[in-house]
């Protein structure tokens, strides 16, 4: 994962701040966090809640300053900054993490989870703990998973009910080889574009559609320019909340336990927010006149994913995790 020159220059100030901060003792400055979602989004509120709990339980000694809305760059950028200690904590989607750790391909597999409940039980259990632990060799401490809902396709051209309806469409995907392969297997043209640039790409016809969850579809105003939403629910990949190993190593054992405790408690808080947000977002996009196709037969989509699974699930550990998750259905 390497920053391009333009992005590197734009993020030089936060990086320098991070380097200077490393010389300070934990508690002399706020912990810094980042999120590409806007203030008020469930993941942002969950991380803020984590910070509030941490501050309350340390009488303000450990506190958090969170930077939402992509203020410090895209997720790939902020993940790299976190690895090098310029950020202390970070909420990112699994897509940029896929780039550095193949174990994280498992929960991002299309049609792996049969329901949100299945996903939550799997990630709260042993499979989730193994996946979080796989981040440690990369300079990251996996704290917890947050919901990212069910990703579905939406576009500006026509209703989609079958994979054939996607044929030839330019579909924005996250910068992940797995997502590229998934969309290509459906006969569409995958187009990696940073999250913050998708609205203009839809307006200008750079892409015809994208895939994301309902709250993101609403929150980004993508529904204004891409009114056809097909509820395929093809991916239920979670968000992951991480801490820099460099920050973790400077915490006392008691503070590490407290960080994990507060992160764990932020999960049900986030899920309650998420469930409410999904319902309200659905109502909003319907009121805006969008066409929601919720009775789609997903089996033809699922049938095309076998080669994608074969391409990305190649290690014994990945295969064991898939079996363990399927057994929890």
Predicted regions and their residues:
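N-terminal secretory/targeting leader peptides
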Residues: 2-4, 12-18, 22-117, 127, ...
